[in-house]
Amino acid sequence: MKTGKPDRPYYQQTVDETLSNIHSTLEGLSGTEASARLQQHGENALPQKKGKPAWLRFLAHFNDVLIYVLLVAALLKLFMGHWVDMFVILGVAIINALIGHIQESNAEKSLQSIRNMLSSEAVVVRQGNHETIPTTALVPGDIVVIRAGDRIPADLRVIEAHNLRVEEAILTGESTVVEKNSDALSGELPLGDRYNLLYSGTTVSSGGGKGVVVATGGETELGHINQMMSDIEKHRTPLMVQMDKLGKTIFITILVMMVALFFFSLLFRDMPVSELVLSLISLAVAAVPEGLPAIISIILSLGVQAMARRKAIIRKLPTVETLGAMTVICSDKTGTLTMNEMTVKAVITADTTYRVEGDSYEPVGNIHPVDDPTPVSVTQGSLLERYLRTIDLCNDSQLIKDEQGLWKITGGPTEGALKVLAAKIPLPPLDTEMRSKIPFDSQYKYMSTLYRLGDEEVILITGAPDVLFRLCQYQQTNDGLQPFDQPYWEGKIEEYAREGLRMVAAAWKPAHEGQRELDHPDLHDGVILLGIAGMMDPPRPEAITAIADCLQAGIRVKMITGDHPQTAMSIGQMLGIGNAASAITGRELEAMDDRQLSDAAQQYDIFARTSPEDKFRLVQALQSKQEVVGMTGDGVNDAPALKRADVGIAMGIKGTEVTKEAADMVLTDDNFATIASAVHEGRRVYDNLKKTILFVIPSNIAQALLIIIALLAGNLIPLTPVLILWMNMATSATLSFGLAFEAGEKDIMNRPPRKANLHVMDGYAIWRVVFVGLMIAISAFVLEAWLQPRGYSAEFIRTVLLQTLVTAQWFYMLNCRVNDGFSLSKGLLANKGIWIVSGVLLALQLLIIYAPFMQMLFGTGALPFRYWVITFLIGFVMFLIVEAEKVLTRRWRKTEA
């Protein structure tokens, strides 16, 4: 029998309608029918996309135009028998590919994490008998038996429930367990409100029941997420795009120069072809910044380590750079912007309204009347004493202190908040005994206990105010009982709801003498309201500061929550979120087309009653407006939005493994302040990357110009390919790390985010690298022209030129460390990295100039001390010229920023 799509959602159908539409019965399917449906629907498993093998992923790192230049150069060296040069050039290409391969993040892990969430076996009813079968054999129409601790094997419609509670946090992000029942529901409901459906991958926390399979494999909610994860293409970061463009520009420039010089030298200089090819190989190797990809990867890796120390784990290297360009952060509320510790802030009785101090589970903080800061004390028999004892005893949670000295609760957050409140004031000692209990249930929304309190026997009740208001006939005062005044209580609830407080009521009544059992009819008369507590999940103090820092840095913060709009706006105002005076709901977003959604995404900063699906659309809407978006999440349903965002941010504590795998960054403390800290670090790393690029490229320009001038003049080629590679890989790479350790500029969080389309090689950067490259090349050329007529050997001249270029690079590194201001500032001494790399560079230069085996390998010769002095003075003069250039071009640089 075929099972197609229902005409209306299964959660809107009764049990009988569901069974009828899916062609099943309470006795289950027959074996024959189950086999036929397995053929029709396929196995209950998520579709898998075949990933690329490791060797193909490694080879992909050679797919770069600059690497092509090196590979061709190595090949030509091989044909010409220059084995050492060939191995050195090829080694550089392989090292670059290895670094890229090691740093690469395997996106397939996120899909594998989803597949790992599926259970392996299920108990089903087939032809009236219970059978244990592999979950892969489940088909629509199977009746599945559900027990506490089970992982739901497919999407089910509940047909029988016994105190069935399910943990759906992996799917919805909401930490509270969900009470499930078999009743039909009406209207369009978000996933988290479909109380008669069970979803594949979620876990039964208590109770049991049965459900009929309504979707398997790729048709389940988990399957839809799996498909979305497969289909989403991650945006390339601005730096990755720019470096590709830079590489292609360098490649085209090299190609044009080589062709022009080949014909010029062949026609006008009558050079032998073999010598000309060697010269052009030197030119190609000189013009390619071979070390730059590796340098960028390593600088990003250092940024990753710095962020890890600040509790932000970066999973994908380019994220470090993207953080600096982020313009919008969409953040969950609970636990990220707030403490995730529900705390009572107000207690309202018929006599008095109290303020409650304290913002965590630690049982400290005074309770005092709103108009009097004097802390209250509790006396035996007072209204406050009875109220506090009621919320303490009619409560399934416990307040405990762990081994680290931190206070925690067991049980639900609402009960936990009441338990903490009761612990803030010592109650008079009293002998108590619980005799019976009605557990809390979402159907009737209250909990009740039967207690002996000393010589008194009482029934205690806590629950939703609207429910207890219907039960109460009286209200308690310190002077006795009064008739229940509902308008008074409703007015108080409305008043405190505007502050974002969630209300819970407490009541009591005398029990019958000798009563041992408690049932719902016992609560139908004589119930006395004691008071209501207003509670909230308070904002993290550090989140308030972090949001202010983000706003100062030009980054808008948007809060996404499942709360009521009024509550969300209240929390938003406490946090200092920009436009917290208005909110929009998920239902309103669902009704919008793409254009309307794009406008709303920019207009509003508070998004209430939202689902994880809304997050995905919000990311797309903001990106359509050219925003660089950071998005937080913890549930499996958040994973597509995190993968789509420019920076996906997962929670390390409450986040699922799937979400962490999909994310670019994981917060180990689930704290919004960590995001702001990561943005600061991202901006610092980008600044240092730009400084590094400005530092590396002039050296390549200078080397290329020296070779071009030599070819045009018909002179000796001043630098061999291996010497060029030494400068590009050993010298430039070593010195670049000094810039990687530079501290952030003072105004780093006072600037707006950089424009994503602003090229790292902007107008000023092009001027700077050409200016410095020309200056280094001219100084080296003049020195070479001075040395050649004096009869020095080719090895000696090359060694002097090598030392000149290296010394010029060292001084230019000092120029690059400060964008605006004198480079020899006090911060120079604070950056130990610069002095470490300077020491390493000195050791390397001594090695290549004086070690016999290095002289043989690289064709160098020993230098007298005076040439160290000469090259040092040349470098120092260039340093002063660049410092003067920074002053003269300051206005231009500010225009480019």
Regions found by a protein language model. Give the residues of each.
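Membrane-water interface at loop-to-transmembrane-helix junctions
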Residues: K755-L774, A794-V800
